[in-house]
Amino acid sequence: MAQINVIGQNGGRTIELPLPEVNSGVLHEVVTWQLASRRRGTASTRTRAQVSKTGRKMYGQKGTGNARHGDRSVPTFVGGGVAFGPKPRSYDYTLPRQVRQLGLAMAIASRQEGGKLVAVDGFDIADAKTKNFISWAKQNGLDGTEKVLLVTDDENTRRAARNVSWVSVLPVAGVNVYDILRHDRLVIDAAALEIVEEEAGEEQQ
């Protein structure tokens, strides 16, 4: 069980969560799946049938002393078609839900092990003002020297933080392995953290 300190408006508390041991292979598998799913897959080349060339034979088969050729659309000529080039396709594939949930729990565990996890019992951000968020961040050791991923469904907090250059904001439903790993710190609602870990635990059973 991992001991996680939770900060809040009415003081702090400690929660215990069954964080798994970090496995870089699982994290790599989940990140690869995420990035593959994001690929647009629009790369496309023209085949020899699609390039704008005449189909006429370049010159006679015999008598010129040159190599034998047909038309100019073949891949050996500049401006010819591309052999076996890319065509629009989907790079998406299915990764088991159990692996995805385990990867998410491991990503959170990696931030906890490095002391880069901040769990919060309700954000005290008044009026959705950016200056109020920055003041709150400084009080809790966030001074802008690190990239921060903020995960919360609190609308005031999300609006207050979205203009801060070193903060990325995600709703609880959007938390994912790739974004956790590419940020230095994870700031997350304690309730959301417990839900994520509970789901991961159910998948492992």
Curated annotation (Swiss-Prot):
InterPro entries: Ribosomal_uL4, Ribosomal_uL4-like, Ribosomal_uL4_dom_sf. GO terms for molecular function: rRNA binding; structural constituent of ribosome. Keywords: Ribonucleoprotein, Ribosomal protein, RNA-binding, rRNA-binding. The keyword rRNA-binding applies. One of its GO terms (biological process) is translation. It comes from the Bacteria. It holds the Pfam family Ribosomal_L4. One of its GO terms (cellular component) is ribonucleoprotein complex. Gene3D superfamilies: 3.40.1370.10. One of the primary rRNA binding proteins, this protein initially binds near the 5'-end of the 23S rRNA. It is important during the early stages of 50S assembly. Part of the 50S ribosomal subunit. Contacts proteins L15 and L34. Belongs to the universal ribosomal protein uL4 family. This is Large ribosomal subunit protein uL4. The gene is rplD.
